[in-house]
Regions:
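Bacterial lipoprotein signal-peptidase II cleavage site
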Residues: 12-25
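N-terminal low-complexity, Pro/Thr/Ser-rich intrinsically disordered segments
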Residues: 30-82, 265
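Conserved C-terminal helix/tail region of periplasmic/extracytoplasmic solute-binding proteins
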Residues: 52-54, 58-67, 72, 423-471
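Extracytoplasmic ligand-binding site segments that recognize negatively charged/polar headgroups
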Residues: 85-105, 118-131, 141-306
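Paired acidic/hydrophobic, glycine-rich loop segments that form the ligand-binding mouth/hinge
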Residues: 140-149, 314-322
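Extracytoplasmic/periplasmic substrate-binding proteins
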Residues: 282-283, 293-365
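Mature extracytoplasmic/periplasmic domains
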Residues: 358-442
């Protein structure tokens, strides 16, 4: 029950979005609602029943029906719709390609004659939005569904424009103690975390999140203009609760350390007021400014991890996907034990990293909407469906039942233990899990609605900062 409660709270953060039907476009919808009464003298009673159904596209009508069905009922609809056909999916994660064969096997367990060909595409360099936009111009699209990240662009480019539709599986809603009608937000497959890690071969330690923006520090980080979820992290720091975390961790610094940061914080007071931020907004802007002007931009988290776990990376740190530790190959100079996860260390103060979601959507012009809904339900409501992601540490299912089954199968919480079960071999690989990371670990969770709200204010301010250049 506790895990379910935590999950629902996190949905309000990592998956929160306006309860806007994708068919609605912001301004025209409002104009229609406000001008209609002026143009007619008919009683309002006649308008009310007609409004709701007309707002639903054909795919949204299917989704509405599908949200009342169990996975098995959806599976039967999928079998009728897609037997012998071709299924195209597109996503930021390549693992959809691994999940689809398992989904097909599941459908074959219901009807042994079922067969479906598939292709899964993973566009690079944030091109997924362009690809989905182009596909939306067709009467019937190529892509049946998508697995996509970056809540800010999803909200502004995909949902408000009616390109993508949210489907909330009944079994997922039940597991989270809610209903499709009551839940407002996007459907997250999982939350991923990027965490502060530092090379510990030397004596240097980082025991406060302000240490990462101290004088002379240059953390390894994927550039905020190449992976936009990293920019969303900075947006989120300006929200009142996360800004308060930064103030709190600042106050835990020594007087000398505070003295270094104080001028920047003071300088940001007027900026925070201009941007309409809360009482602690200056602390957030100061941290963001110091971070953007100091991080050493990298192209991918894999190379960052490879750098940090090498003994030669003494005194370096990075902010990167936690799960990258899974693929470290131990050698005389390379080891997971050459790094520490900052938030796992006793006495660490402040944010431990940030969390962002992979969201699932049906395309509004989906050629196979029932099959898309069934596939989405399979991934979010069964441990087998989530296993393509769940087999590795650092990816947390949004379904508490699936999360529990995943841990029971893969034992990520003791992933760093030796075979005897008592010796800690690699402390950093003992994944403390979603519940810990979103409480004690102080993970900053992406909120798509908040990011979209501040993208033109805080976002424009960030654009004016001068990035650090290692060259």
């Amino acid at each position: 029950l506790l895990l379910a409660a935590v999950m629902v709270l996190s949905m309000a953060a990592c998956a929160a979005a306006p309860a806007t039907t994708p068919a609605d476009t912001p301004a025209p919808a409002e104009e229609t609602q406000t001008t209609e009464p002026a143009e007619t003298t008919e009683a309002p009673a006649e308008e009310t029943p007609a409004a709701e159904p007309e707002n639903l596209t054909a795919t949204q009508q299917i989704i509405k029906e599908a949200e009342g069905m169990t996975l098995e009922e959806l599976a039967k609809k999928a079998i009728e719709e897609s037997n012998g056909k071709m299924f195209y999916g597109v996503g930021n994660s390549s693992r959809g390609k691994s999940a689809l064969p398992l989904f097909i096997e599941y459908l074959q367990s219901i009807d042994s004659s079922y067969n479906m060909e598939f292709e899964w595409q993973q566009p690079k360099n944030n091109k997924i939005f362009d690809q989905l936009t182009a596909d939306s111009l067709k009467g019937t699209g190529t892509f049946a569904m998508t697995l996509i990240q970056d809540g800010n662009q999803i909200e502004s480019k995909m949902v408000q424009t009616g390109i993508l539709d949210t489907f909330i599986p009944k079994d997922w809603a039940d597991a989270n103690g809610t209903t499709a009608d009551a839940y407002t937000g996007f459907l997250p497959l999982q939350t991923l975390n990027k965490v502060f890690m530092y090379n510990c071969v030397g004596d240097k330690t980082y025991d406060n999140c302000w240490d990462f923006v101290a004088e002379g520090e240059h953390g390894l980080y994927m550039d905020i203009d190449s992976e936009i979820v990293g920019k969303n992290f900075l947006y989120m720091l300006t929200r009142d609760d996360y800004a308060a975390w930064l103030k709190e961790s600042f106050e835990a610094l020594s007087a000398d350390e505070q003295a270094y940061f104080q001028p920047t914080i003071a300088e940001m007071e007027s900026e925070a007021a201009d941007l309409g931020l809360g009482a602690d907004g200056a602390y957030a802007l100061a941290w963001i400014k110091l971070w953007v002007e100091s991080y050493n931009a990298q192209t991918d988290d894999g190379p960052i991890c490879n750098t940090l776990v090498d003994a030669s990376a003494k005194d370096q740190f990075g902010l990167l996907v936690y799960s990258k530790l899974r693929s470290v190959e131990e050698s005389s100079s390379v080891s997971v034990n050459n790094i520490k996860v900052a938030a796992y260390e006793d006495g660490y103060q402040g944010i431990g990293g940030y969390g962002y979601c992979h969201y699932l959507f049906v395309t509004d012009n989906s050629p196979l909407p029932w099959t898309a809904c069934a596939f989405i339900a399979y991934m979010t409501c069964t441990a087998d469906g989530f296993s393509a992601w769940g087999k590795d540490m650092g990816g947390y299912s949004s379904n508490p039942k699936v999360a529990e089954e995943t841990e029971a199968t893969f034992h990520h919480s003791i992933g760093g233990m030796a075979e005897d079960g008592t010796t800690v071999e690699f402390a950093a690989k003992n994944d403390r899990g979603y519940d810990w990371w979103t409480t004690n670990g102080k993970l900053v969770l992406e909120d798509p609605e908040y990011c979209a709200d501040v993208a033109f204010t805080v976002g424009s301010w960030i654009e004016m900062l001068t990035k650090y250049s290692a060259g």
